[in-house]
Amino acid sequence: MDMTRIPKQKLVIIAGSPCVGKTTVAEKLFTAYENSAFFDGDWAWRVNPFSINDPRLRNGNKTMSYALSTYLNSCFDYVFFSSVVAAYKETREAILNDVTANEYSVLGFTLTCSEDTLLKRHKKRGDKNECSFFWLHLAPCEGDYVINTDNKSVQQVVDEIKCIVDEY
């Protein structure tokens, strides 16, 4: 096997705080590429009431791993995965360790913005929960490309990520 060959399949992870724009950006990226798939981590654990302290929350990781495995094993060239929990190194590693596909590359992106921008986006979304800056101040996972979304349109952020994905 040629060890210098970069796998054709790319798993693109979009992490960041709630309301930073992960889903919106990932949806746009997904439609910009042929033979692509998109999975939003929010779909993996949609429960009421939701609590970050719920010990069952990590069960959603298995759903994420399964969905990503299914897309990669179905030979999609690009798989886009957006999730707030992918901001945590240990959680991301646990999800990726359970992916059953082989020979794919992983590109990680962390979207960020100012507290003021996050608050404006939170209000615009109409979220009734209190806006938290906790995730905004987490250090990005090692190796992630950090994209500051302040004063950028969704398309500008998509184009910035697309340049990196296309060069990889």
For every predicted segment, state its role.
Residues 14:
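Hydrophobic anchor at the beta1->P-loop junction of P-loop NTPases
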Residues 17:
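P-loop (Walker A) phosphate-binding loop of NTP-binding proteins
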Residues 20:
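ATP-binding Walker
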Residues 23:
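Walker A/P-loop
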Residues 26-69:
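Conserved substrate/cofactor phosphate-moiety recognition/catalytic segment
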Residues 59-102:
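Glycine-rich phosphate-binding loop used to anchor ATP phosphates in small-molecule kinases
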Residues 102-122:
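Conserved phosphate-donor/acceptor-positioning beta-strand/loop module used by diverse small-molecule
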Residues 123-162, 168:
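Small-molecule kinase domains that catalyze NTP-dependent phosphoryl transfer to phosphate-bearing small molecules
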